[in-house]
Amino acid sequence: MTFDFMLKYSFDKVMDDVQLLVSRLRAREESVDILRQQLCKLQAQLLSMRQCQETILEFDEFSKRVSNQPKGPLIICLAAENKQLEQLKIENKTLRNSLDEHQTALDMIMTKYRGQISKLMRTYQVEHLVQSVINPDNNENRCIKSFYPGPKSVNTPSTNSIDSQSVSQKSNSGKVDEITDGISQSLTEQFTTVASIVRDVTDRGDAYATELEEELHRLRSENAGLREILMISSDCCPDTNSNDCVLPPVSLPNKDSIQHESSSLSSIQSGRFHFLDEDSSSIHLPGIDECLSSVNVNEDSFLYNIPNPSDDSSNSGTISGNHSDEDSDEDDNTVYEVAMNQMINSL
């Protein structure tokens, strides 16, 4: 008795110790899980902080590069929007890949479903063929017997043999019916399982498709908003480089000092002619090169050839008319100098 009591006491003590160890292990596992979750959170925070630091450094470098340009803030905003657009493109790619995977999975499921249905149809046809081969005219014989009952049975050896054959046929037909019933039950069970699986898959697929459509609609709306913002920013800051070549008008006050010339100067080069209109009171210079080659004066539609002092040798052979006098050349030079001085003062 004492030995049994000691064994029982030691066994109870061992069980208590095991329970304590199990409880301690569970507590330690829970603490380890908590620490693991905290480490994952800290790791995610560190990754986000690193990404923020990298983006800040890139933004600082980009802002330093763009600070000297007149459209620096606009370029910075566009760079930030470009990053957002890149993120949206990546999300669109992931969504497209998921859609492709979903479509492939649905195709696989539908192929399996079609294969199962084809197998069921074949087995059903085979069962009908077997039944028709085993008892081809059961229904017809039953109808005939019901309308034309046969004579009474007589105890003869031929009738006994016929009865034994009919009994054996009935037993065989009963076995075949049992086999066909088992096959049909198994096939119906398989069909029901496949149908339930297909229903679950279709329900999940519809839910996933609706979620994807909502996400695509949201992304498209965000993309449209970003594009509108880009258009507005581009419209608010138009390009002013096309107006740099337009100069203010120049007026020539000393009109009496200019001598009128005849209309016989029409054979001179077209680049050196200057047409004078009655209504033009000032000169609109579209460019510096054109300002150096044309001047408009308010007179009664006369033609002037204002020569360039550097091109006297080249133009001496082309000028024709009544410009052989030295006085007219001096007057032309004075007119050219006055026009150049006015243009320089206006610039």
UniProtKB/Swiss-Prot annotation:
O-glycosylated. It comes from the Eukaryota. Residues 307-316 have a biased composition (Low complexity). Keywords: Coiled coil, Glycoprotein. Residues 153-174 have a biased composition (Polar residues). Pfam families: SIKE. Residues 76-109, 206-233 form a coiled coil. Residues 149-177, 303-332 are annotated as: Disordered. Involved in protection of the schistosome gut. Belongs to the SIKE family. This is Circulating cathodic antigen.
